[in-house]
């Protein structure tokens, strides 16, 4: 059975130091080779924390493969807005504003990992994360926007997004 190591690394900037080196060193793999593969696979997510799985297929031959996950919703929101971090006073001092199109783009990227049954539910999950980060949606409190989604205010945008 293959061994699996899961780590969270900064896209395109994995290094042989912690958390990677200590996790893969004992597996007998060439740490530099693994780090190079991870950096190549995560270069599109530069500046974001990305979940990575290192699957050791054959420890004797030292063969492995890398699986790159999608960054957490909070990382996607930060990238979309170009902000370094969420608000330290969420609900009092917003740090950015997402449009519904941006919310839908993030929801589509994360859909496979979410428990949401449809795009609207996934968008509401993204909006919930925006709330906890101190980010407004369409210039409003995220809770208000979630209610508006339930009321059908954004149905046309969702219909266009699902085409």
From Swiss-Prot:
Keywords (A to Z) from UniProt: Ribonucleoprotein, Ribosomal protein, RNA-binding, rRNA-binding
Record-level Gene Ontology MF annotations: large ribosomal subunit rRNA binding; structural constituent of ribosome
Gene Ontology biological process terms from the UniProt entry: translation
Domain of life: Archaea
HAMAP family: Ribosomal_uL11
Protein family: Belongs to the universal ribosomal protein uL11 family.
Function, in words: Forms part of the ribosomal stalk which helps the ribosome interact with GTP-bound translation factors.
Name of the featured protein: Large ribosomal subunit protein uL11
């Amino acid at each position: 059975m293959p061994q699996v190591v899961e780590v969270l690394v900064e896209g395109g900037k994995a290094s042989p130091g912690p958390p990677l080196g200590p996790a893969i060193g004992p597996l007998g793999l060439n740490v530099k080779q693994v780090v190079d593969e991870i950096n190549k696979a995560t270069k599109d997510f530069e500046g974001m924390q990305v979940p990575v799985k290192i699957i050791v297929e054959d420890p004797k031959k030292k063969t492995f493969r890398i699986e790159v996950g999608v960054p957490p919703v909070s990382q996607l929101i930060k990238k979309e807005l170009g902000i370094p971090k969420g608000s330290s006073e969420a609900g009092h001092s917003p740090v950015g504003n997402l449009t519904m199109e941006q919310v839908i783009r993030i929801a589509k990227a994360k859909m496979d990992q979410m428990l949401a049954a449809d795009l609207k539910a996934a968008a509401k999950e993204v909006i919930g994360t925006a709330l906890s980060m101190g980010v407004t949606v369409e210039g409003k409190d995220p809770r208000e926007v979630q209610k508006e989604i339930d009321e059908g205010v954004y149905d046309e945008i969702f219909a266009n997004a699902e085409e």
